[in-house]
Amino acid sequence: MCDEDVAALVVDNGSGMCKAGFAGDDAPRAVFPSIVGRPRHQGVMVGMGQKDSYVGDEAQSKRGILTLKYPIEHGIVTNWDDMEKIWHHTFYNELRVAPEEHPVLLTEAPLNPKANREKMTQIMFETFNTPAMYVAIQAVLSLYASGRTTGIVFDSGDGVSHTVPIYEGYALPHAILRLDLAGRDLTDYLMKILTERGYSFTTTAEREIVRDIKEKLCYVALDFEQEMQTAASSSSLEKSYELPDGQVITIGNERFRCPEALFQPSFLGMESAGIHETTYNSIMKCDVDIRKDLYANTVLSGGSTMFPGIADRMQKEVTALAPPTMKIKIIAPPERKYSVWIGGSILASLSTFQQMWISKQEYDESGPSIVHRKCF
């Protein structure tokens, strides 16, 4: 289908960040925020070359004068016009390629509505004229990236988390669970608990600062109550952070209270089960014969699993729920922030995968519904 010199493009569209690059590479070339911004004010300076929309980092840097929109909410595309802008930006500005010359592998959230897959397919063939394309489920790609074909993936990004049991390369849809608790919620929660300490963060620009604090200083406690006592009795857990204006703030128990919400969503006023329970529930929805393989291959993926201590805590919590003799192994690869993209890069460069692409010819013959027959 595709010549060796024409590398496939791999595009992983997340709620928070878009990751894009070439199949065969070991990391994405372009990583930028999945945002589209439009000016709030009328331009007054002629010849400034002001645009009617900005995408990604440029939108982020001009956010003071723009209205920002996220076309992907909770992992699912909700605004196709803006999504098209993001793809256009990905191909032409970030990767600097002509999409009509490369096969494109896109990723989708688990349980993505059928109409959405068709729309993605249609846009790729009709707007960007790609010679071939394929749509793969994000969690499945993360599992490939860890070198497995069977296991359960807990994938948590900025907008949504999922537990996806996979057996011999196929996701088991009846056992997939979605949890609308992810990075953005943790950032909001950290903003809230920092306010209680007397630091005020409210604007979207300040939210980015808090996101940085979260990424640099937060961690998951092995024993939450114990850690709270340690934090109360000594200052050993305190860390300082310098704000862009030079002011230095100190944070203590907020460092582990923030990601604790993953295990105790009640902190956010949510009634849902924590990530350990959700993982367990997902395994229990699977056939009794394959549970052992899932417990022994629990893979973490996505940016919101990057907190230090999360794997040990997950091990402890799942062990407490599982049958006593069960062997439980939590796999947290160091590159898990990009493991979906890496899995896509691996998949698209396999020789055995080359007959799996949906070609332009097949699309012209069958229309968008071809995606359900070829991508599953």
From Swiss-Prot:
The keyword Nucleotide-binding applies. It is found in: Cytoplasm, Cytoskeleton. Signal peptide: none annotated. It comes from the Eukaryota. CDD domains: ASKHA_NBD_actin (cd10224). The modification Tele-methylhistidine is found at H74. It catalyses: ATP + H2O = ADP + phosphate + H(+). One of its GO terms (molecular function) is hydrolase activity. InterPro entries: Actin, Actin/actin-like_CS, Actin_CS, ATPase_NBD. The modification N-acetylaspartate is found at D3. The modification N-acetylcysteine is found at C2. Keywords: Acetylation, ATP-binding, Cytoplasm, Cytoskeleton, Hydrolase, Methylation, Nucleotide-binding, Oxidation. Belongs to the actin family. This is Actin, cytoplasmic.
